[in-house]
A protein has these predicted regions:
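Short active-site loop/helix that positions an aromatic residue
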Residues: 98-114
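Short, solvent-exposed secondary-structure capping/transition elements
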Residues: 110-118, 231-232, 286
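Short alpha-helix boundary/capping and kink motifs at helix termini
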Residues: 5, 11-92, 96, 102, ...
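Polyanionic (Asp/Glu-rich) segments that form extended negatively charged tracts
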Residues: 144-335
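Extended charged low-complexity segments that act as oligomerization/scaffolding linkers
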Residues: 122-156
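Flexible loop/turn segments at secondary-structure boundaries
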Residues: 84-87, 98-99, 213-216, 227
Length: 335
């Protein structure tokens, strides 16, 4: 069961806090129940799944310690209602935790199958991973990931063999090793049932649910403006999305996705943003870039659009300097 409540926030000290208090519903839920109760989707503009071996190890060890005490708080999950699909909600913050939990359920289901507990395995799959749409004769995932992760995750859920190597598969292999050790024989299968129950009712999260993307990013920025370990790209995305307003959010999302997709590494994207800023204003340190961008951009939707128009235009020239054969150069008349 979800325990729903309207939290009474601290007295608002600024516009962001007022918007959070007026437009955010906060619900107490549990990580496993979240996958059971909702249809979730990671937007295409979010970063791909990136948890590595150390993250998974820490997650597993935290779970095992918490099972002894009976409860575990995993922080805040920020969701936004999806204007294009009212049956699902978009994951704005918490993607890594939710995806890892889903992968763990895949590992639990598969281990139960290994041990011959097919009914229990089917129960885990139908509750946490996918629904079967009888009329359409297909399964629908309870969690949809971004384009870089969706294929591998779907193959895991649907038990296909040709899964490409990547972070999703690596995390599955590691978690499967852990659950294999947790239930080494058929006599130990109840350890997996107990773990499933703990994920459903012992791993607590605080849900912040916003009516739309721009409101969700205001919530996310407010929750994370006191020391969270976010990159400059993360902070800038949050700033732009929270400032876009309902009329500009689709444009901001589209441009951000186009520009960000041209860089394989977040550090390279930030380097471009820094060079673009310095081309107009002079030198700025990496540490001071985000605050400088805030002052440069402004807070209105019109200012956000103007900034992104300039960024997209600068990107063409920036990439051309790195690619001598770029078609950009052929468009410049020779003297």
């Amino acid at each position: 069961m979800v325990t729903s409540c309207k939290l009474q926030p601290r007295p608002p000290s600024g516009t962001k806090e007022i918007l959070v208090s007026n437009h955010a519903d906060f619900d107490h839920d549990h990580l496993g129940h979240l996958l059971m109760d909702k249809r979730l989707a990671v937007p295409n503009f979010q970063r791909p799944y990136s948890w590595d071996h150390n993250n998974i190890e820490e997650f597993w060890e935290d779970l095992q310690r918490a099972r002894e005490s009976g409860s575990y708080f995993m922080g805040t999950i920020v969701l936004a209602n999806d204007a294009s699909n009212q049956s699902r909600q978009l994951v704005i913050d918490g993607q890594q935790r939710i995806t890892t939990a889903a992968i763990l359920f895949v590992a639990i289901r598969n281990r139960l199958n290994d041990l011959g507990k097919t009914q229990a395995a089917s129960d885990v799959g139908s509750k946490h991973l996918a629904d079967y749409i009888l009329v359409e004769e297909r399964s629908e995932l309870k969690l949809s990931l971004g384009p870089d992760d969706e294929v591998a995750y779907r193959k895991l859920v649907e038990e296909e063999d040709d899964i490409s190597i990547g972070a999703i598969y690596d995390s599955y292999v590691q978690l499967k090793e852990y659950v294999d050790r947790l239930a080494p024989s058929k006599d130990d299968y109840k350890n997996l049932i107990a773990l499933t129950s703990f994920l459903d009712s012992g791993v607590q999260v605080l849900l912040a649910i916003a009516p739309g993307l721009s409101e969700a990013y205001v919530i996310f920025e407010t929750l994370n403006d006191r020391g969270a370990d976010l990159t400059t790209a993360d902070l800038l995305k949050n700033y732009l999305f929270s400032s876009a307003g309902s009329d500009s959010i689709d444009y901001v999302q589209a441009v951000w996705t186009r520009v960000n997709s041209r860089f394989e590494k977040s550090d390279d994207f930030v380097k471009f943003l820094r060079h673009e800023y310095m081309s107009r204003h002079g030198r700025v340190t990496s540490r001071g870039l985000y605050k400088a961008l805030q002052a440069d951009i402004g807070r209105s939707p019109r200012e956000v659009r103007r900034y992104l128009e300039g960024v997209e235009d600068a990107l063409t020239r920036y990439l051309a300097f790195k690619e001598p054969d770029s078609s950009y150069w052929s468009s410049i008349p020779e003297d």
